[in-house]
Every structure is written in structure tokens, then in C-alpha cells.
Amino acid sequence: MKTLGNIPVIKIESQIFEKLEKNINSKFKMEKLDNSSKRLLPILKELKAVTDSMVNYYGKKEHLADGFAKGQQLHTNFLKIYKRYKESSDAFKMEVANKSKERMQKILETYKNEGSLIKYNLTILINSCEDFVDKMDNQKLSMTTFIKGDLGKLKKAQQNILVASANFQKAIANEKQLKKENYTKERLEIFNKQLAEFEKSVTIFIKEIEKSKSMSKSEIEKKVYTEDMAGTPNDVIKKYNKLVNDYNNLMN
């Protein structure tokens, strides 16, 4: 999204077409994902043609001369194409997610078959943490709306983290397993410290939502959260990003 004057206009970069075409023409064929890409590509090109016209139209300030006459038609065309784009884009994202799940399942099976129980449980744990963050994102929870989050879904995701965390701690308590996978207690301690920070932030996050359920509308409106407060969406994501960094260090 770019702004021309005070008017926001979507700009689609050409590189996205190159990436889709490269994936479609790849020697590694994935039928469902390739088909989703093939459906998405022409619609995306249509959308780019309209958005490029909008950028040109507003960039040259033609809207000031014709009283937005052409602009109205461009916006009408954009909305028609965007509806088709949204449907194809959602299908494409679903296929990407499915492929990602398949790939992760193969990785987990490999770890399990080779007896790498620490890596196995660590991968499940980080996926559980990612799932919690995804549920926050799917509910579009922000600093001002997060206390309205779906408590049931979020608590279930939190419970998955706690179960995965407990299994991971059991795995790293085995001295023979540590030696087999070439891990030291010092390296794992760094990860565990950040894991505790993330779990604490998630716990506070959940408690804030629970408390809001018994608050009146006026009490909720008076409640003020700052970005650096523990348990806010920003804090959860900040702690999660640090955890992912420590996870990557462990896996390398």
C-alpha cells in the first residue's frame, strides 16, 4: 500500500509473478499447489493492471480534473477483481499451509525414526507456540481489541504449549539423550529461559482476557495498555520472536 497525496493505493510488485511462475515451472511438481498458483496468477495480473492505472491516475492528479469520474470506474473494477483474487488467494494459502503441514510431519517422522527425541519434542513445542501466535493473528487481536479474543481457542492453544513444554523437559532430562544429540545443558538453559518468558507472557495475556469477561463496558473502555506491558499482543509476539531465534540456534 502506497499513498499518493492523501489517497492510499495498492501497488503490486512484479516480483510476485516471477515467484509464482518459477514455482509452477519447477521440476518439483505439487499438483494442488501448482493448480492454485495457476488460478491465482492471471487474476493477480488483472489486479496489477488496475492498481497500476490507479497509481498513474492519482499520481498525475487526474482526479482533480475529472472529479473522480475515472477513479470511480477504477475502484469498481478493482473491487470486482479483488473479490476473485481473495477467493483464489485463500485457496492458495490453504494449499501452502497443507504442504507445510505435510513437510513438518515428515520431519517429525524422521526425528522419531532416528531416535532424536529432543529435536522431535522441540519441534512440536515451537509449532505449538507458533499456533498460539497464529490464532492471535487470525482473530486480528491488537492492543485495543485483544481482551475480546476467543478465550476457548486461545486457552486450548495455551494448553498445547504446556503439554509440549512438559514433554520437552522430560526429553532433555535424559543424560544419554543429551549426549546422543550433542546438546549441552548450557545451550538448553538459554532456550528454557526464553521459553519461560514466552509462557509467562501468554499466561498474563489469557488472564487479561478472562478478567475482561467480568468487567463492564465502561471499565473496559477505561483500561489502557501500553506496548511494553507484559501479556499484551506486542509482548507475546516479541517474546515469541526471541524464542524462535533461540530455537534456530539450537537446531543449527
PLM feature spans:
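Extended amphipathic alpha-helical interaction segments
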Residues: 75-195
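Solvent-exposed, polar/charged alpha-helical surfaces in well-ordered, non-transmembrane soluble domains
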Residues: 35-38, 42-45, 49-52, 76-83, ...
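Secondary-structure edge/capping motif, primarily at the C-terminal ends of alpha-helices
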Residues: 23-27, 51-65, 99, 103, ...
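A cross-kingdom marker for long, charged
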Residues: 153-252
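Amphipathic alpha-helical coiled-coil segments
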Residues: 10-20, 54, 80-93, 163-171, ...
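A short acidic/glycine-rich loop-to-helix N-cap element
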Residues: 66-76
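Post-signal peptide N-terminal segment of secreted/secretory-pathway proteins
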Residues: 1-66
